[in-house]
């Protein structure tokens, strides 16, 4: 996907209250932008970082600008979690993810299970179904290695339990890590941050949930998933 109109490059002053970021333009003007990422944004919110914002002309919006990209340790990183479903859908459509190819039908945000949850993407072929949960990944902890989650995620563990239930009911299920950065080759569960999530992820993989990861090419003009990444479920240490 490409950003249209072009993004605006500014300097990050601070990110706060999860949804807000103060920035400064090259000519010294300061204002507040919307931050579309509720995670900890570990390693992606250092004051002084170069960031890129999109602009909306909608007069009803409280904040006209939305934070899209940040330069972190020399890599451009897409921090907008709202783009991840679209990116994975595009990757499925292009055939990048072989494990999810060949499904003629696709629906978004479909209710499923007995708790009223919504699945990010539902692939269908007649009575056959594949439930696809998407997780946006931004945190990298060492050269080429990204982790998820970057904060304790009870919701993430719940989603894994629901995917396992779908497999037990005879359906297919997959979790796709959408890594919006180009300097990663492997994704690992963040056991040091959320050990329960790591446990549930391994249980899900053993139960038949496909655990997949794709890496993006990120540039100021857009983001596209273009590589399949390794997923390492071995226990650290």
UniProtKB/Swiss-Prot annotation:
It holds the Pfam family SfsA_N. It comes from the Bacteria. One of its GO terms (molecular function) is DNA binding. NCBIfam families: sfsA (TIGR00230). Belongs to the SfsA family. This is Sugar fermentation stimulation protein homolog. The gene is sfsA.
